C-alpha cells in the first residue's frame, strides 16, 4: 500500500445542442422563455396587487351598528358623571364592575378628546384626519 496515486482531472466540455437554440429564431425562443418566467414570478409575488389594480375592493356597506355609533354621544353631568346619549335615551356610562363612571374634570376630559366642550362622540377620535 505504499503506492502513489496520481489523479488527473477530467474536464467535460458542456455542449448545449438543443434544437430551439440552433434555429435561426433562437433569440426569439429565449425571449419567450424569459417572459414566461417573469410572468410566473410576478404572479407569485404580486398576484393580489395586480388583481386589486384592475378590480378594486367594494366599499363595505354601512351596517346598523355603525349608524348607531355615529349617533352616540358622551355628555357630562354637573356631578361629574359620564353619560351616554343615544337616540333611544340617555344612559349612565358604567365601569367594568357596573358602577357609574364619575370623573372630577369630566368636561376637561371631553374637551381633550376632540375639542368639544360639553359633548362628543366617543368614536370621533378614530375618525381624525
Swiss-Prot record:
Localization of this protein: Virion membrane
Keywords from the UniProt entry: Disulfide bond, Fusion of virus membrane with host cell membrane, Fusion of virus membrane with host membrane, Late protein, Membrane, Signal-anchor, Transmembrane, Transmembrane helix, Viral envelope protein, Viral penetration into host cytoplasm, Virion, Virus entry into host cell
Post-translational modification: Most cysteines are linked by disulfide bonds. They are created by the viral disulfide bond formation pathway, a poxvirus-specific redox pathway that operates on the cytoplasmic side of the MV membranes.
Chief location of this protein within or outside the cell: virion
Membrane topology qualifier: Single-pass type III membrane protein
Source taxon at top rank: Viruses
Gene Ontology CC terms: membrane; viral envelope; virion membrane
InterPro entries for this protein: Poxvirus_L5 (IPR006956)
Cysteine disulfide partners in this protein: 76-106
Induction: Expressed in the late phase of the viral replicative cycle.
GO aspect biological process, one term: fusion of virus membrane with host plasma membrane
Stretches that traverse the bilayer: 27-47
Stated family: Belongs to the chordopoxvirinae L5 family.
Description of how the protein assembles with itself and partners: Part of a stable entry-fusion complex (EFC) which is at least composed of proteins A16, A21, A28, G3, G9, H2, J5, and L5. Formation of the viral membrane is necessary for the assembly of the complex. Interacts with G3.
Task of the protein: Envelope protein part of the entry-fusion complex responsible for the virus membrane fusion with host cell membrane during virus entry. Also plays a role in cell-cell fusion (syncytium formation).
Name assigned to this protein: L5 homolog
Lineage, top ranks: Viruses, Varidnaviria, Bamfordvirae, Nucleocytoviricota, Pokkesviricetes
Amino acid at each position: 500500500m505504499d503506492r502513489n496515486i496520481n489523479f488527473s482531472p477530467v474536464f467535460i466540455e458542456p455542449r448545449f445542442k438543443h434544437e430551439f437554440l440552433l434555429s435561426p429564431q433562437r433569440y426569439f425562443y429565449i425571449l419567450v422563455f424569459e417572459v414566461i418566467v417573469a410572468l410566473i414570478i410576478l404572479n407569485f409575488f404580486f398576484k393580489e396587487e395586480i388583481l386589486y389594480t384592475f378590480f378594486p375592493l367594494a366599499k363595505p356597506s354601512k351596517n346598523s351598528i355603525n349608524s348607531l355609533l355615529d349617533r352616540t354621544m358622551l355628555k357630562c353631568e354637573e356631578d361629574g358623571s359620564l353619560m351616554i346619549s343615544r337616540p333611544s335615551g340617555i344612559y349612565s356610562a358604567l365601569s367594568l364592575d357596573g358602577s357609574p363612571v364619575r370623573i372630577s374634570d369630566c368636561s376637561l376630559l371631553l374637551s381633550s378628546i376632540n375639542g368639544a366642550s360639553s359633548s362628543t362622540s366617543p368614536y370621533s377620535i378614530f375618525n381624525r384626519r
